[in-house]
């Protein structure tokens, strides 16, 4: 941070609290108030960091004229709904998992794959799935998941294809169908 600031770069930090070393030397600091991250590999502030980056992007979009005030306000309204919707999403995820628990837990590896913005979702899903039920998992971009690893997929691999109905929807459906029909271990 010191070197970047000395070189004339505009710098900003996001930390769990105001008393961290980075917060104290940062010319612009955002306090996430997520609590102490006792272990470096635990990222309790990840979701808060993502949300803050999104909010900054919205504000910059408004300031630079890429968003109208009405669009900006609508996005802010959506953001305000997140805490309340979290409980419902958690319950839906639990119900989804319970209905598929046997299939998932008998698999030696869970593979998440998705196109476009769902690639990031597949990576995060793989991390969370390894953390929570503690089953080895990996995330691929849809194209990667179709052309390389699919020759190695077998009934031990549960491939979860994320599909938002976008331009890669047919490819996503094709991979899911292949895993369901040939290897009997795919979900969409």
Please describe what each predicted stretch is.
Residues 85, 109-112, 160-161:
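A short, structure-level motif marking secondary-structure boundaries and short turns
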Residues 52, 95-99, 145:
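Well-ordered alpha-helical segments embedded in enzymatic catalytic cores
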């Amino acid at each position: 941070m010191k070197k970047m600031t000395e070189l004339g770069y505009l710098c900003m930090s996001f930390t769990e609290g105001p008393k961290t070393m980075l917060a104290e030397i940062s010319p612009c600091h955002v306090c996430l108030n997520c609590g102490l991250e006792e272990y470096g590999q635990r990222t309790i502030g990840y979701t808060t960091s993502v949300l803050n980056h999104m909010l900054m992007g919205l504000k910059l979009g408004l300031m630079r004229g890429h968003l109208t005030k009405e669009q900006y306000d609508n996005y802010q309204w959506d953001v305000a709904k997140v805490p309340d919707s979290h409980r419902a999403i958690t319950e839906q995820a639990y119900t989804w998992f319970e209905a598929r628990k046997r299939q998932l837990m008998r698999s030696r590896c869970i593979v998440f794959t998705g196109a476009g913005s769902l690639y990031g979702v597949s990576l995060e899903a793989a991390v969370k799935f390894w953390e929570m039920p503690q089953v080895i998992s990996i995330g691929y971009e849809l194209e990667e998941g179709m052309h390389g690893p699919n020759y190695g997929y077998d009934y031990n691999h549960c491939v979860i294809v994320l599909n938002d109905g976008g331009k890669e929807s047919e490819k996503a459906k094709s991979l899911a169908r292949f895993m369901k029909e040939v290897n009997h271990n795919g979900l969409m």
